[in-house]
């Protein structure tokens, strides 16, 4: 493999055995592609905004004299960029402008004659835009729209598993689910009649639907039944025979063949042998006794030709006397329905008997009564209702997916049918459910991923937009009918409010629009790749059973079987597998390599769950030779959802990668194959809660996916084009682009601005640091700057800690963790948290609130950190209770005492009519002010601080732009110099020419002269562009802010809080091994090895066997080896050994094991080897991909290379006594994470605080500054101890005895430590509740 300059800084040793056929796809594509389809112009009009417009427009007036047509739309430019939106707290969106055409028709002339056409662009609200990382900024916060897994439209057949009826009989049902519109269900009842329900309402006999579609009884019988024909002879009947129909029946008479031989005697069972005999003798007729036809059902009406009297009606049983009448009337041929108990049930025939309707109108009225109970039906209303239910394109749409699923299930050609149902469709569904009831077909598996599809952002936004448009449509139709159309323009008809309201509601408060989990890059990526079965149109937690939550064979390679939350949502919220993607229908598909005649090719094909079932698919770990031929005779593979063994020649596809089945979070766990699945689930979930540490450190034992994840997450800065680093500082990187990657006529400079110390959604700190130096050559995709939790472009969620597995004085009982003081001193797990505190000045009834440093009754010391505007300085260190922003609120007029009046008269009246409502630091917080933002309403005078901040921003913008201009100008001038040199100037002449005049020189060569003139033009353009950009920025900075009604000013203060690790914080490894820190132990007391090096962390060995996450032990061994190799390299560097020796050792490390990774260290220059060695001295980073990782043998080889015992165990000594422990201890390096469950956020104690209004008991919870509940069981405990006085105190003065507790404060102040318990308030509440039942209880107080 060829490594770029940056990649050569640090190469991860990969233990993967299989070559990578397919790179990990871009991880956020599910979000970005979906939204792109929504906003991009689609000429076919099948999706996105275009589809929504085309489905609603044209809107015709009721009279048909005018219509409003849609022409095209365009999205404008957003006013603010993403960062500005986050700071100002507004939505990142673009205005939608739609070109509409209003057409008026001439009433007098022929229909369709156009009288007038008006075209106009109309504003239709703002559409939130997706940022390049797949998120939305709504009201200043980043949100993610989670994709939904819902039941695909189409037709589904199912049964109730015998649960509905007490007999345990299985009742089948069919359901037609449209994309939008009414559901149509068919179901059997215990008596085997078929019923229909519309929208899950009251059931009707299914034949009512057929009658409503204008089928007669005769038509219905002909569609659903075959016939048996009889001819009447004198005293017997002759039946037309199809021998196959007799199978399984018991003969009620002797059955003779065509030659008159008895084939089956009376009372015997007819078998396949008998049927073969009858077929052999070519028997086509059979004489049967007259009684045989009695009880059979007539297939049609029989009418006396002379009198016209109906002798036998269709679907009725034939009696003996009917036969006599038919003979008399001269009717010789009779047909009956072919029915048998086994596989031709009489279901429709029975249903017709229940059906009370006889014609179309009665059926329509019956349906109308069921849908609209209580309304009197009219013929037109009934017809319109039924027509609108399933046959109107406005009200019903199966969608492309639904039609495809419907046709495939009913074996109809794919191109037949539209978005609405046809008569044939309904008949086909009824035929299929009868076929299933007859046992000739199977029911569907609704948890199969071929029956569930993904609805992503774009599609959901389109649906919401359409909802808004439909609301507008009604209003437009009314306005078209009412007003004088000659005067109106399209914009007078359209009100954009309903549209923006629908869109806003979806992005702001839909269940699937979630506050982005921004703890670290992994949690961002997994949140965007999440697939939820909950949400509108999905399941609910309470109703979801086990089957839906379970892992299904079709999840293979599509949804991760590991990563799902614990708790009530388990299995309902899933994560997309690493390589999965959605196809055009919204079904998940996964890639496979094609296998031809036992040879694996490199052709990759994506298969959906439906297609996959047809093929035989082998796993990724089968043995292949050099040509890709499968070596094993019998190969483990999957076919039709089952795992089997098959011959190599039968294999049609094979997996692309062993990591194919798991999600990104699970594939970050090394040695995943050695962990129990439950613990792996916890490991995957806990990595998402890791807090970014102060100094990120790459994992020594990784899986090789860390880099792809960090780059795709968007937290690092990756180079857009190759070039050379021209300038680097903490907030900006400038790259001079390579000549071959330039677009014509551009300056060839890329500028990357870095994000510095901003706050994430979870209050962690987002900060980018450059990881390149001036002069470094870079290629496209190289990482230029690290973000939070990344280290040289690798994801780095935690720290490599030296771990020993041993008990230590009970301090690691029950998963507790003992850590060394050194971890705290070195700031290994120190994290920075940024809190945003805001102070709002409002306009109140009594006057407006004011932000000022002049606060009543506050001492000088409290104001020491404020400036003259009353706002805290940047850099001030503040603690709980300090004032950040001084604010006073007008107080209502109160009756003044004469003394106060006198004081007012003397000192002026300002001080007493305002009260202090300043923003203070919350109690448990101490930190440093790192930023202050002031937002002022338009038209309100800006204070001094706001103007200062504005000027600072303007200066910053000017500096940024002028530096950018300088760099671009330099690019132009350097090209001009090159031209002049080529045109005959000498270097000395060039040096003498002032910069400004370079572009005005004259060259003899005409082409060069024109090039120089072009450069001069470009320079002018740059100048103009600079002025324009600066003016635009200045205008943006100085304009007033659009604040909520009644708000005059908002001041936001950002505090940075530094949190070191301390007892009570939660830590975890990557294998679900979590624990809480119990003690921070002095370095000298920690166990140490023979070299005197103490360990960092002591974990309990009992946490491993019962939990079966052995991966952590292997990780520790591998980590020890990696660190040991790093130590050896460091020693070589310190001893300044020959580069050749260093190169040899590094080569040995990379070549170890049977891996497919080949690092050609020989091709590296000496400088590159030394630079690589400097990055490896902290440990050789290794990668063991899931299911394809390092084997035990390789770990031992690594330990040998590091010069460590292959047991992985060392002799340790007790730090307190100096004695060796009695047996060797497993010591190595484990990657530990600090999780976002910090004791500082949870610790809470109440002195006195607020009380609940009704019960007068203290509130609960940290947010309310609440107390600890002394509950029922705690009362029992005190009763058991007989602690009567303590109990009385708990139930009265410490809780809800209002008078008692105020009296107690007074007593404490007076130094009298006694209490007088009174009546608890909750007793009075109980009395009131009993009175509300009408029972009067009064308390006689003595």
UniProtKB/Swiss-Prot annotation:
GO cellular component, one term: DNA-directed RNA polymerase complex
Gene Ontology biological-process entries: DNA-templated transcription
Listed EC numbers: 2.7.7.6
Keyword Cell inner membrane: no
Classification via InterPro entries: DNA-dir_RNA_pol_bsu_ext_1_sf, DNA-dir_RNA_pol_bsu_external_1, DNA-dir_RNA_pol_su2, DNA-dir_RNAP_su2_dom, DNA-dir_RNAP_su2_hyb_sf, RNA_pol_bsu_bac, RNA_pol_bsu_CS, RNA_pol_bsu_protrusion
Catalytic reactions on record: RNA(n) + a ribonucleoside 5'-triphosphate = RNA(n+1) + diphosphate
PROSITE patterns per UniProt: RNA_POL_BETA (PS01166)
GO molecular function per UniProt: DNA binding; DNA-directed RNA polymerase activity; ribonucleoside binding
Record's keyword terms, sorted: DNA-directed RNA polymerase, Nucleotidyltransferase, Transcription, Transferase
Assembly and interaction partners: The RNAP catalytic core consists of 2 alpha, 1 beta, 1 beta' and 1 omega subunit. When a sigma factor is associated with the core the holoenzyme is formed, which can initiate transcription.
Family statement drawn from the similarity comment of this UniProt entry: Belongs to the RNA polymerase beta chain family.
Protein's name according to its UniProt entry: DNA-directed RNA polymerase subunit beta
Species this protein is from: Shewanella amazonensis (strain ATCC BAA-1098 / SB2B)
Gene: rpoB
């Amino acid at each position: 493999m060829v490594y770029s300059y940056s990649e050569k800084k640090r190469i991860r040793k990969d233990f993967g055995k299989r070559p990578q056929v397919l790179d990990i796809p871009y991880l956020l594509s599910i979000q970005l592609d979906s939204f792109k389809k929504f906003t991009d112009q689609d000429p076919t009009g099948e999706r996105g905004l275009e589809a929504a417009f085309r489905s609603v427009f044209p809107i015709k007036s009721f009279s048909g004299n005018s219509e409003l047509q849609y022409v095209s739309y365009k999205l404008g430019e957003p006013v603010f960029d993403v960062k500005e939106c986050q700071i100002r707290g507004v939505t990142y969106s673009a205005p939608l402008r739609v070109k509409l055409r209003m057409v008026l028709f001439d009433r007098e002339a022929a229909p369709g004659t156009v009288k007038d056409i008006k075209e106009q662009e109309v504003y239709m609200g703002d559409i939130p835009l997706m940022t390049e990382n797949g998120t939305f900024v709504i009201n200043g916060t980043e949100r993610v729209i989670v994709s939904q897994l819902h039941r695909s439209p189409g037709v589904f057949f199912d049964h109730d598993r015998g649960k509905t009826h007490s007999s345990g009989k299985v009742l089948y049902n069919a359901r037609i689910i449209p994309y939008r519109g009414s559901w149509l269900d068919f179901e059997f009842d215990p008596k085997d009649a078929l019923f229909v329900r519309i929208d899950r309402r009251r059931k009707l006999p299914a034949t009512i639907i057929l009658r409503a579609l204008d089928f007669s009884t005769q038509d219905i019988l002909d569609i659903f039944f075959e016939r048996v024909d009889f001819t009447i002879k004198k005293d017997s009947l002759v039946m037309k025979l199809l021998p196959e129909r007799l199978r399984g029946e018991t003969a009620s008479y002797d059955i003779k063949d065509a030659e008159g031989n008895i084939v089956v005697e009376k009372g015997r069972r007819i078998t396949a042998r008998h049927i073969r005999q009858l077929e052999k003798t070519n028997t086509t007729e059979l004489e049967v006794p007259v009684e045989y036809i009695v009880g059979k059902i007539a297939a049609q009406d029989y009418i006396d030709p002379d009198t016209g009297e109906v002798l036998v009606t269709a679907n009725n049983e034939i009696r003996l006397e009917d036969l006599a009448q038919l003979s008399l009337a001269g009717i010789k041929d009779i047909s009956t329905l072919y029915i048998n108990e086994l596989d031709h049930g009489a279901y429709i025939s029975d249903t017709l008997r229940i059906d009370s309707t006889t014609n179309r109108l009665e059926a329509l009225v019956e349906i109308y009564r069921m849908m609209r109970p209580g309304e009197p039906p009219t013929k037109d209303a009934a017809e319109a209702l039924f027509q609108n239910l399933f046959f109107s394109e406005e009200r019903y749409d199966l969608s492309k997916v639904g039609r495809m699923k419907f046709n495939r299930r009913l074996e109809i050609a794919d191109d037949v049918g539209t978005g609405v149902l046809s008569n044939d469709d309904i008949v086909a569904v009824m035929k299929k459910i009868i076929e299933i009831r007859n046992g000739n077909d199977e029911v569907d598996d609704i948890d199969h991923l071929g029956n569930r599809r993904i609805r992503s952002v774009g599609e959901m936004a389109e649906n919401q937009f359409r909802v808004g448009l439909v609301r507008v449509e009604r209003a437009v139709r009314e306005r078209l009918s009412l007003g004088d159309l000659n005067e109106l323009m399209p914009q007078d008809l359209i009100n954009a409010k309903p549209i923006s309201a629908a869109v806003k509601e979806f992005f702001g408060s839909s269940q699937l629009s979630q506050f982005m989990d921004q703890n670290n890059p992994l949690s961002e990526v997994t949140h965007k790749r999440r697939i939820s079965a909950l949400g509108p149109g999905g399941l609910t937690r309470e109703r979801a059973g086990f089957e839906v939550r379970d892992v299904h064979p079709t999840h293979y390679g599509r949804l991760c079987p590991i990563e799902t939350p614990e708790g009530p949502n388990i299995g309902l919220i899933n994560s997309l597998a690493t390589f999965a993607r959605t196809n055009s229908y919204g079904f998940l598909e996964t890639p496979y390599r094609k296998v031809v005649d036992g040879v694996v090719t490199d052709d990759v094909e994506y298969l959906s769950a439906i297609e996959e079932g047809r093929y035989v698919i082998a796993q990724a770990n089968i043995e292949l030779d050099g040509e890709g031929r499968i070596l094993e005779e019998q190969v483990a593979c999957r076919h039709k959802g089952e795992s089997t063994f098959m011959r190599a020649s039968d294999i049609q596809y094979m997996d692309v990668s062993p990591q194919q089945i798991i999600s990104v979070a699970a594939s970050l766990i090394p040695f995943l194959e050695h962990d129990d699945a439950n613990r792996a689930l916890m490991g995957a979930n806990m990595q998402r809660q890791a807090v970014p540490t102060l100094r990120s450190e790459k994992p020594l034992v990784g899986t090789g996916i860390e880099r792809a994840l960090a780059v795709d997450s968007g937290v690092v800065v990756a180079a857009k084009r190759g070039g050379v680093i021209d300038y680097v500082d903490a907030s900006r990187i400038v790259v001079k682009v390579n000549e071959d990657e330039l677009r014509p006529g551009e300056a060839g400079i890329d500028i990357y601005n870095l994000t510095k110390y901003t706050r994430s959604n979870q209050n962690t700190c987002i900060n980018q640091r450059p990881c390149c130096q001036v002069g470094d050559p870079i290629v496209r995709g190289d990482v230029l700057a690290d973000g939070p939790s990344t280290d040289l472009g690798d994801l780095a969620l935690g720290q490599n800690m030296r771990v020993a597995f041993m008990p230590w004085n009970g301090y690691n009982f029950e998963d507790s963790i003992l850590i060394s003081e050194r971890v705290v001193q070195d700031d290994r797990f120190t994290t920075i948290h940024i809190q945003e505190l805001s102070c709002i000045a409002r306009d109140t009834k009594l006057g407006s609130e004011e932000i000022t440093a002049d606060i009543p009754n506050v001492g000088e010391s409290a104001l020491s950190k404020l400036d003259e505007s009353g706002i805290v300085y940047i850099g001030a260190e503040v603690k709980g209770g300090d004032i950040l922003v001084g604010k006073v609120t007008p107080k209502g007029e109160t009756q003044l005492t004469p003394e106060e009046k006198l004081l007012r008269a003397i000192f002026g009246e300002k001080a007493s009519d305002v009260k202090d409502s300043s923003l203070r630091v919350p109690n448990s917080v101490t930190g440093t002010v790192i930023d202050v933002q002031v937002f002022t309403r338009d038209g309100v005078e800006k204070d001094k601080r706001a103007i200062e901040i504005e000027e600072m921003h303007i200066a910053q913008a000017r500096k940024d732009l002028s530096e950018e201009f300088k760099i671009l100008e330099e690019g132009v001038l350097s090209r001009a110099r090159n031209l002049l040199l080529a045109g005959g100037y000498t270097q000395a002449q060039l040096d003498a020419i002032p910069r400004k005049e370079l572009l005005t020189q004259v060259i003899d060569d005409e082409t060069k002269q024109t090039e120089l003139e072009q450069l001069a033009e470009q320079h002018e353009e740059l100048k103009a562009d600079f002025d324009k950009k600066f003016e635009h920025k200045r205008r943006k900075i100085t304009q007033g802010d659009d604040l909520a009604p009644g708000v005059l000013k908002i001041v936001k203060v950002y505090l940075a809080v530094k949190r070191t690790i301390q007892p009570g914080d939660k830590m975890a490894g990557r294998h679900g091994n979590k624990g809480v820190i119990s003690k921070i132990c002095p370095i000298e007391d920690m166990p140490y090895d023979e070299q005197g090096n103490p360990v960092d962390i002591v974990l309990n060995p009992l946490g491993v066997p019962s939990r079966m996450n052995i991966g952590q032990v292997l990780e520790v061994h591998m980590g020890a080896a990696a660190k040991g190799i790093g130590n050896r390299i460091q020693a070589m560097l310190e001893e300044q050994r020959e580069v050749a020796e260093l190169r040899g050792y590094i080569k040995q490390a990379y070549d170890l094991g049977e891996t497919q990774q080949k690092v050609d260290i020989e091709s590296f220059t000496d400088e590159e080897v030394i630079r690589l060695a400097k990055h490896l001295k902290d440990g050789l980073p290794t990668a063991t991909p899931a299911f394809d990782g390092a084997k035990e043998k390789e770990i031992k080889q690594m330990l040998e290379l590091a010069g460590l015992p292959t047991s992985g165990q060392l002799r340790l000594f007790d730090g307190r006594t100096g004695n060796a422990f009695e047996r060797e201890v497993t010591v190595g390096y484990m990657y530990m994470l600090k999780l976002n469950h910090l004791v500082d956020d949870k610790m809470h104690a109440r002195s006195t605080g607020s009380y609940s209004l009704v019960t007068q008991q203290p509130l609960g919870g940290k947010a309310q500054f609440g107390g600890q509940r002394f509950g029922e069981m705690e009362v029992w405990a005190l009763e058991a101890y007989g602690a009567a006085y303590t109990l009385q105190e708990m139930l009265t003065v410490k809780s809800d005895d209002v008078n008692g507790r105020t009296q107690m404060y007074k007593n404490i102040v007076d130094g009298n430590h006694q209490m007088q318990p009174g009546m608890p308030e909750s007793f009075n509440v109980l009395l009131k509740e009993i009175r509300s039942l009408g029972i009067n209880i009064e308390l006689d107080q003595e």
